Amino acid sequence: RRENYRLSLSVSPAATVHVDDGDGRDPAASCLRVLDISGGGVALAVPDAAVSMFQPNVRLPPCLLRLDDAEPLPVAIEVAYAARHEVRGNVAWWRAGCRFVDLPAAIEQQVMQFLFRTERHRNARQRRGG
């Protein structure tokens, strides 16, 4: 049972997690789209080539969470699960459920503000019929 409200994200607003894997790869290769987010963690879209990093109970290297155009937030993330999500253009994508570890209260507050702001914008759009 979930302790936190979880918000599914579409392409907009943009939320990404940058994983510093330390191997000197192109930074874009380690920039992962957030599929959903809560105060307790994120689900990430992970390309097939990177899924080996996303094994259950593995704590990822230092990560930066970017919510819309705000400054990136440093977060510690531990993988809860990884499951095949979809295939797009002959490339398999995985859904990796991850929990925040020792999230500072100030960063948790910023995540929650993003959730509420995004939900308010969605509700306003729906009321306008869009």
What are these regions (language model features)?
Residues 1-130:
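Structured alpha-helical
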